[in-house]
């Protein structure tokens, strides 16, 4: 088990070490909630989230990159939320086919500049608007690919944070 100090350790030495292990875990959960409920929810759950049993009550931090740290701080609570978020992903994947995921498309009107780099990872399912550089389109299939790549990155960062503290990864 990690101590609170180990969970919250950060460093300015590397870009990947600016978020603690706790924040990495929290971001894994919030990322799933943001993508699948906030961004895709109106298409995937047009009648609300009742079928998801209480998943309409999660709160994001004001920064929007992780869960509200006033409510979701303890690692055990974060892991429950991560499990709930993964349950949403599982529910969607069980309800969709590859073909249906390729047909569903989300219009993003506030696409951040770092998506220029992310776009290179998506040979299908992601495209830019012809004129407006802030608008992009992403399919549900590409969204799950993005979530997968993000999860690998954050899990790897957790391992690096542990190693940087002299903890076996």
Describe the predicted segments one by one.
Residues 1-22, 38-51, 66, 92-107, ...:
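Helix-loop segments that flank and shape redox-cofactor active sites
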Residues 21, 75-82, 144-147:
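Hydrophobic packing residues in well-ordered alpha-helices of helical domains and bundles
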Residues 112-113, 153:
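Charged, low-complexity intrinsically disordered terminal regions and linker tails
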Residues 1-6, 23-41, 145-153:
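Alpha-helical bundle segments that constitute or directly flank the non-heme di-iron/ferroxidase center
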Residues 31-102, 163-169:
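Short, helix-capping/interhelical loops that line the mouth of catalytic, cofactor-
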Residues 141-166:
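A hydrophobic membrane-anchoring alpha-helix module
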